[in-house]
Every structure is written in structure tokens, then in C-alpha cells.
């Protein structure tokens, strides 16, 4: 067996070996020459599903989530059911919670993003129909 020249990388607790070139020159690269990390299964070891859409809000561990969460994971994820049953997926840029219109803020209804109440004078919106009750928001 020829000595293998390569890089051993460690990033975020995941290690992998990437072979640079076969040392003896006649050996071809194959999947056997690369050690890949095991499949990630974070949120309470449920099954990751990629085809479905995130459901917001969802309840996980007696807490209501209005957007993707890091709870129990190194990566943002969401539930595929309103009450988490083990079906989940990692969030992509298209999965994050959307603004809810109209929403109530300080007893008044708004149909667009607002700057009122913003410390940094940026437009924001509520992630629920009633900001006064839930207090969840994001910048627009």
C-alpha cells in the first residue's frame, strides 16, 4: 500500500481526509480514498426531511418558535409540523419565517413594515399577527 499524501481537516467537530494525489501515480482516486463525515442528525435524533416546508410557529420542548432555531443543534432547523413530532429539516435561505401582515403593534394594525419603535431606525415587521402578545419580529 502506497503512502497517501493529503490534508486532514477539522472544522466544527467534523473531520475529513482529502487525498491530494496518489503517491505512486498509477492509483486512481475513488470514494474509498476520501473519509466523509457521518450523516448529521441533530434535533432529538428525528428524521431530517428535505422535501417539505417549515411550519411557523411550531412547538418544540414546550416552547413556541416563530423562526428557525439552533435549539439542540449546531445548524438552524425547523419543524415540519405545528407540534414537533420528529419531522424536521435544516433551514435554507427560503425557509426563514416571513412577515405576517397585518400585525398589531401598540394596539394599532399595520399592513407594511414599519420604522416605529426601531432602536436603529430600520424597518421591521412582526412574525405573528399580534406583536403586542408574542413580541417576535425581524428586520424587513
Swiss-Prot record:
Span of domain Fibronectin type-II: 49-93, 94-140
High-level lineage: Eukaryota, Metazoa, Chordata, Craniata, Vertebrata
Function: The BSP-A proteins from seminal plasma exhibit both simulatory and inhibitory actions on the release of pituitary gonadotropins. The exact function of these proteins is not known.
UniProt GO cellular component terms: cell surface; extracellular space
SS bond partners: 54-78, 68-91, 99-125, 113-140
Signal sequence, start to end: 1-25
GO molecular function terms attached to this record: heparin binding
Protein name (database record): Seminal plasma protein A3
The UniProt record lists the keyword Cell inner membrane: no
Family as reported in the entry's similarity comment: Belongs to the seminal plasma protein family.
PROSITE patterns referenced in this protein's UniProt entry, alphabetically: FN2_1, FN2_2
Subcellular location: Secreted
Family annotation (PANTHER family): SEMINAL PLASMA PROTEIN, SEMINAL PLASMA PROTEIN HSP-1
